[in-house]
């Protein structure tokens, strides 16, 4: 079955909506995704060498959050046709008829411009340009092109979700470095294993709307094998901050243990029989992958603040 191309499939009801509530517009921002963006951007800002005025740092994080939300709104606007068909997304504001498509588009474009301009004026134009590119990459390159045209959609499009720590870093330094690239790679390499785990137990949904996710195109076996490869690469990237001097040996051990579990989960998915109705290993992999990424960046932050905390405790004692 192919994706419905008619942008007006919602009918007249979608274009003649009653006033939408603030909660509906907030949902357009994809708050769960935005929380991860904010957290990893904050990590990049804190881990970057140098200092930034706390007020400017707060403005930077808010602008990155708004930019992420804007790209989420644009994604929901464009994907309203397939969201209406998939059970996982059918209750989103546009397909459920709570917000008109044109209102979502205007909302996303306004927030995009606002976040980029304010970040440029308040912090620096390099980070603003990188934010603009991130929004464009997610809303246009991934959503409008890659998502519906290639099973590599998540692999390439995952770059959009990997930019936040680099954005936070750029807000402090005005540029990028090897360490910021490593932070980018942790998320970039993590994305395929994370999303393909979801795609495995949502194959029917993606197949119903014609989205060429890897399990639907290459099959379960090939997808599972590739998940192992990306899990191993993610593990290597996760321990890399220790080798570059960005983090201590304590973090290196912590990341290695978490990464070993991540890789084990990918092998557990590989052992799952094809056509398994419950797909419990894939669901566990998906759930753990979220905790894993939060834990890795939490570990980096804890490692960064550990010396200062130790000094404070020593002073008190």
Curated annotation (Swiss-Prot):
GO biological process: heme O biosynthetic process
Any single Pfam family the record assigns to this protein: UbiA
Primary enzyme class: transferase
HAMAP family: CyoE_CtaB
Function statement: Converts heme B (protoheme IX) to heme O by substitution of the vinyl group on carbon 2 of heme B porphyrin ring with a hydroxyethyl farnesyl side group.
Pathway(s) this gene product operates in, as recorded in its UniProt entry: Porphyrin-containing compound metabolism; heme O biosynthesis; heme O from protoheme: step 1/1
Bilayer-spanning residue ranges: 33-53, 54-74, 117-137, 154-174, 181-201, 242-262, 285-305
Additional observations: Carbon 2 of the heme B porphyrin ring is defined according to the Fischer nomenclature.
A GO CC annotation given for this chain: plasma membrane
UniProt keyword terms in alphabetical order: Cell inner membrane, Cell membrane, Heme biosynthesis, Membrane, Transferase, Transmembrane, Transmembrane helix
Name used for this protein in its record: Protoheme IX farnesyltransferase
Catalyzed reactions: heme b + (2E,6E)-farnesyl diphosphate + H2O = Fe(II)-heme o + diphosphate
